[in-house]
């Protein structure tokens, strides 16, 4: 834990470290977080089967310090299998049209060594979105 209980993790090649707000963790995914994760894993590609399995036993380890909906994930590795032949980010999506009130946003699903790692929202508005759209 860093200053004021904020956890910092190195994000990997080319990405700055992400800082997570302190809180009651681990915790289950909220209904909206679980729905968003299912949406991100909905393409009918058999390579995603192990990630869908992981999503069923994933929990939240932290949330982004900026107040956005980004969540740091952990998976019960005894109850799911590791994905292979996939790199991170594994899934990305963007808003199809510009929303003047909220601006555009992107959702990105990251892996670490074949395990679900982070469900990230990238936003371009002034205020961070506190939940996934």
Model-predicted regions and their roles:
Residues 98-133:
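Short, compact, well-ordered microdomains
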Residues 2-94, 130-133:
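N-terminal domain-onset segments
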